[in-house]
Amino acid sequence: DDCLGMFSSCDPNNDKCCPNRKCSRKDQWCKYQLW
């Protein structure tokens, strides 16, 4: 499966962002997960 890169639009309920990234519920795109 291809993962979604930085700033790719995504679905918070079906997070397909790459490792160390998280789908932002507010902005609906993949952001770095800093925590």
Swiss-Prot record:
GO terms for cellular component: extracellular region. It is found in: Secreted. Expressed by the venom gland. It holds the Pfam family Toxin_12. The presence of a 'disulfide through disulfide knot' structurally defines this protein as a knottin. Gating-modifier toxin that inhibits both sodium (Nav) and calcium (Cav3) channels by inducing hyperpolarizing shift in voltage-dependence of activation and steady state inactivation. Inhibits Nav1.1/SCN1A, Nav1.2/SCN2A, Nav1.3/SCN3A, Nav1.6/SCN6A, Nav1.7/SCN9A and Cav3.1/CACNA1G sodium and calcium channels at nanomolar concentrations (IC(50)=81-301 nM). Surprisingly, selectively slows fast inactivation of Nav1.3/SCN3A. Also shows moderate inhibition of Cav3.2/CACNA1H calcium channels (IC(50)=1233 nM). Its main location: secreted. Negative results: shows no or weak activity on Nav1.4/SCN4A, Nav1.5/SCN5A, and Cav3.3/CACNA1I sodium and calcium channels. This is Mu/omega-theraphotoxin-Tap1a. GO terms for molecular function: calcium channel regulator activity; ion channel inhibitor activity; sodium channel regulator activity; toxin activity. Keywords: Calcium channel impairing toxin, Disulfide bond, Ion channel impairing toxin, Knottin, Neurotoxin, Pharmaceutical, Secreted, Toxin, Voltage-gated calcium channel impairing toxin, Voltage-gated sodium channel impairing toxin. Disulfide bonds join 3-18, 10-23, 17-30. Belongs to the neurotoxin 10 (Hwtx-1) family. 59 (Tltx) subfamily. It comes from Theraphosa apophysis. It comes from the Eukaryota.
